[in-house]
């Protein structure tokens, strides 16, 4: 009987003692749920992060710092991407650019070491060539002027922190030479690749036109040289013919003078006409006509004419 009253008290005591424990565990559970909520959200944000950070980070651009400088080399992996991208795009025209890059990355990881080394060796050779060209470029006046401008602007930025903050807030970029903004091009994007393709196609077209023009120019130069040689040859022949013509004219004039002097003592029968330089042709025609009409009568005249002609021929022909 004495234990009867204690049982309710004992029962109530554990009940009352258990209630605070349950309440406390409930509060802890609620706190844990509230604490786990943000952690789950944080985890979700971490899981979404790789999706947001595909490609080159937003707001960052690869810059071509050196105007007119040597082209920076690419890695062996990038050389592999450039070589295989068009093949994949031709085979899968509807595949987006990130998926193509993903496929190429998987293909690169499975590539045989010997084949992969080929791209790495080519990249190393290109890097050595770039370093050689870069050292030569750094000795040029253009690079020195550009470096001076960059240093001056850097000093101005350090002296004026407020100006730097305003520049950063306004989205301006400092420390570049004049005209550098044209070289801020994000690479490995569709626009960049398409622009490169268009420029390379234009360069190929211009090179082809240049070769065609050079060939035409060479042909025209050969024609010009041939025509010049022909003209010189014709000019020489013309000068020779002019000299011959002058000599013949002088010889003809001497023969006419000799004939006029020799036939001055032989008048035309029946008319008594004697020749002069201006009438020699008419005189010879009339003399020939008179002899033909009666050759027997003018035998002595014929003999004399033959003697005169033989003498003139021996002296002037």
From Swiss-Prot:
Keywords: Cell cycle, Chromatin regulator, Chromosome, Coiled coil, DNA-binding, Isopeptide bond, Nucleus, Phosphoprotein, Transcription, Transcription regulation, Ubl conjugation. There is a cross-link at residue 31 (Glycyl lysine isopeptide (Lys-Gly) (interchain with G-Cter in SUMO2)). Its main location: nucleus. One of its GO terms (biological process) is regulation of gene expression. SUPFAM superfamilies: HMG-box. It is found in: Nucleus; Chromosome. Residues 53-65 have a biased composition (Basic residues). Residues 1-22 have a biased composition (Low complexity). Residues 190-257 form a coiled coil. The modification Phosphoserine is found at residue 160. GO terms for cellular component: chromosome; nucleus. The keyword DNA-binding applies. It holds the Pfam family HMG_box. GO terms for molecular function: DNA binding. Residues 1-71 are annotated as: Disordered. Residues 31-52 have a biased composition (Basic and acidic residues). The keyword Lyase does not apply. InterPro entries: ChromReg_NeuronalGeneExpr, HMG_box_dom, HMG_box_dom_sf. CDD domains: HMG-box_HMG20B. Required for correct progression through G2 phase of the cell cycle and entry into mitosis. Required for RCOR1/CoREST mediated repression of neuronal specific gene promoters. Component of a BHC histone deacetylase complex that contains HDAC1, HDAC2, HMG20B/BRAF35, KDM1A, RCOR1/CoREST and PHF21A/BHC80. The BHC complex may also contain ZMYM2, ZNF217, ZMYM3, GSE1 and GTF2I. Interacts with the BRCA2 tumor suppressor protein. This is SWI/SNF-related matrix-associated actin-dependent regulator of chromatin subfamily E member 1-related. It comes from Bos taurus (Bovine). The gene is HMG20B.
């Amino acid at each position: 009987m004495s234990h009867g009253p204690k049982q309710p008290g004992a029962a109530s005591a554990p009940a009352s003692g258990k209630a605070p424990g349950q309440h406390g565990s409930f509060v802890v559970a609620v706190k844990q749920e509230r604490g786990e909520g943000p952690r789950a959200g944080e985890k979700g944000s971490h899981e979404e992060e790789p999706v947001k950070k595909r490609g080159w980070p937003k707001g960052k651009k690869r810059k071509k710092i050196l105007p007119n400088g040597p082209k920076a080399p690419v890695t062996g992996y990038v050389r592999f991407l450039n070589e295989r991208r068009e093949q994949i795009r031709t085979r899968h025209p509807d595949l987006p650019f990130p998926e193509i890059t993903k496929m190429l990355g998987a293909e690169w990881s499975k590539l045989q070491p010997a084949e992969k080394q080929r791209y790495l060796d080519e990249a190393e050779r290109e890097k050595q060539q770039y370093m050689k060209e870069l050292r030569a470029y750094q000795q040029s006046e253009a690079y020195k002027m550009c470096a001076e401008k960059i240093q001056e602007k850097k000093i101005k930025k350090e002296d004026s922190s407020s100006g730097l903050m305003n520049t950063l807030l306004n989205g301006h970029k400092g420390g570049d030479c004049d005209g550098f903004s044209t070289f801020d091009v994000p690479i490995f994007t569709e626009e960049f690749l398409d622009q490169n393709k268009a420029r390379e196609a234009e360069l190929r077209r211009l090179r082809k036109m240049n070769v065609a023009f050079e060939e035409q120019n060479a042909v025209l130069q050969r024609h010009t040289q041939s025509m010049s040689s022909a003209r010189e040859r014709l000019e020489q022949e013309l000068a020779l013919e002019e000299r011959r013509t002058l000599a013949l004219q002088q010889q003809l004039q001497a023969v006419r003078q000799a004939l006029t002097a020799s036939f001055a003592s032989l008048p035309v029968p029946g008319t008594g006409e004697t020749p002069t330089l201006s009438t020699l042709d008419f005189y010879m025609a009339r003399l020939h006509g008179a002899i033909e009409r009666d050759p027997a009568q003018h035998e002595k005249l014929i003999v004399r004419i033959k003697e005169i002609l033989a003498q003139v021929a021996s002296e002037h022909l």
